[in-house]
Amino acid sequence: MYLFHLCLVFACVSCPTVQASKLCLGWLWDMDIDPYKEFGSSYQLLNFLPLDFFPELNALVDTATALYEEELTGREHCSPHHTAIRQALVCWEELTRLIAWMSANINSEEVRRVIVAHVNDTWGLKVRQNLWFHLSCLTFGQHTVQEFLVSFGVRIRTPAPYRPPNAPILSTLPEHTVIRRRGSARVVRSPRRRTPSPRRRRSQSPRRRPQSPASNC
């Protein structure tokens, strides 16, 4: 596992981001560093969510590529969430290369199975949590994700007899949502507004109808 940690550091050291440094150094030396604190969240809140809540890595990577490919591959600094997603993708790419190298050089099928299972259950889970958090912040808004995590944590810590039947659902879009379509410019949703009802046309009664000069003759 030391080789895995070194690959993480080597993969992220070339990228001048504090977020990546916190993440990699914390994993390497087991430092008490929470990469979610600067976003108003914490590892504890994310750990309240069940393990099967987070989608598979392939699904998360496909989502990140489909929605934010231009931002992730460009040289501009879009937001801290984009930077964190970049580093998570780089770390996972190096991890998959390491697993492929180990699978090719280890003859024991049992050892390979144990190593792959351990990586998926530990570091793979951390990458899944990281990608889900930052993708959700970009999609729903950071404040909405914070409220969801707090609500879910409160529900989990509430005794079962007093717990509401349904868990919170992260499904509310913010007022301003940036939607990017492939091959086109960004489309910004305007704030939600109520559609005004059409004005009623006043019916003119016979008394109010203007009379023609011929009718007065």
Swiss-Prot record:
InterPro entries: Hepatitis_B_virus_capsid_N (IPR013195), Hepatitis_core (IPR002006), Viral_capsid_core_dom_sf_HBV (IPR036459). GO terms for cellular component: extracellular region; host cell; host cell cytoplasm; host cell nucleus; T=4 icosahedral viral capsid. It is found in: Secreted; Host nucleus. Sequence repeats lie at residues 190-196, 197-204, 205-211. Residues 26-28 are annotated as: HBEAG. The keyword Ligase does not apply. The record marks 189-190 as: Cleavage. Residues 181-210 have a biased composition (Basic residues). GO terms for molecular function: DNA binding; RNA binding; structural molecule activity. Residues 190-217 form a propeptide. Phosphorylated. Residues 1-20 form the signal peptide. Gene3D superfamilies: Viral capsid, core domain supefamily, Hepatitis B virus (1.10.4090.10). GO terms for biological process: microtubule-dependent intracellular transport of viral material towards nucleus; symbiont entry into host cell; viral penetration into host nucleus. It comes from the Viruses. Keywords: Disulfide bond, Host nucleus, Host-virus interaction, Repeat, Secreted, Signal, Viral immunoevasion. Residues 181-217 are annotated as: Disordered. Residues 190-211 are annotated as: 3 X 8 AA approximate repeats of S-P-R-R-R-R-[PS]-Q. May regulate immune response to the intracellular capsid in acting as a T-cell tolerogen, by having an immunoregulatory effect which prevents destruction of infected cells by cytotoxic T-cells. This immune regulation may predispose to chronicity during perinatal infections and prevent severe liver injury during adult infections. Belongs to the orthohepadnavirus precore antigen family. Homodimerizes. HAMAP family: HBV_HBEAG. This is External core antigen. It comes from Arctic squirrel hepatitis virus. The gene is C.
